[in-house]
Amino acid sequence: MSTDLDLADGFSDVPPINGGVNELELDMRDCGGVVRIHRFSRTRGQADRAVKAGRAIRMLPGVVADAGRADDSRVKMQAIHMWHRDAVIIGKAALVAQGVIPPGSRTRDFSAVHEVEAFSRTRGIKREGILVHRWRVPRRYATQYRDVPMAIPEASVLLLAVRGEWEWVCEALRQKLVTPRSCRSARSCLSWKFGRHRITAALADISFNPWSVPELWLSRALRAVGFTGWHSNTRVDTAEGAFTLDQAFDAERVGVEVDGRCVHGTPEGYEATMMRSASLDRHGWRMLHITPTMLRQRPRFVLEWLAQRIHKRHRPKVMMSDHELSRIMLGLTPT
């Protein structure tokens, strides 16, 4: 009864749910803390008693999980798979399972996922921490991951982008699980669910290839006022190594870096930033350093400062107010 998903992710180490070993406990150990209980299952009585005693919970109809592991997203994924074999995991849980390190984490931490999403052609259900949509997503956008059906990463990224959950989208792009091009090729996976304009807008932002939300803000602002001649996350080779610039104006050799405190504010980050700027300066690049706070509070100042450093042909024809730019950066006003 074991599956590759549980054993590979350490599901087998489940504590006993009572003082003695019984068939239900053995099944839970084999299946990573969750079991399917049919009407005539030999362990149905044991499951009823365990639920009544608070040692197990009914996670989904016919699916019982160890109460001590019920919050584990991997257990929820396994429960969905046991409940309906055709259900396809999508969203944050799928991205973490496929290798994405969640925002703010240093490891592939499933605890960052508070709700596991899936879709099925024939069933839909909502329980605490579980949401299964009744969607008819084309099968070509689903794949097998350790015996559990999961949506391809591009489908999950596009879903999160349409919803505005850009921290996860940026991490998937930064960690190169997806690319703007691969996301464009999957645009029809949700075209029946969301309007064409919403998907087009999400893909337009993904095309910037932002690796952080502040980078996305800056890209939206540059596009809105009409800057030209720039590219996001451009690789520059120098004698000291290769560096990736947040925004680069190749003709002027002007780069823009959005320096956040969590990375650039540490002693190691500060030293790396200084060495990086010096190396790029030796290579003929002029670097402009801004912070997310500057961009959020004074976006017009940032854009006017940048405009002074580039050729006239690449400058915007008009400039917007801070209020207008802020709404555009946050995605409240379409561009």
Task: Please report, for each region that a protein language model flagged, where it lies by residue.
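Surface segments flanking catalytic/ligand-binding clefts of nucleic-acid enzymes
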Residues: L7-N18, R42, L173-T335
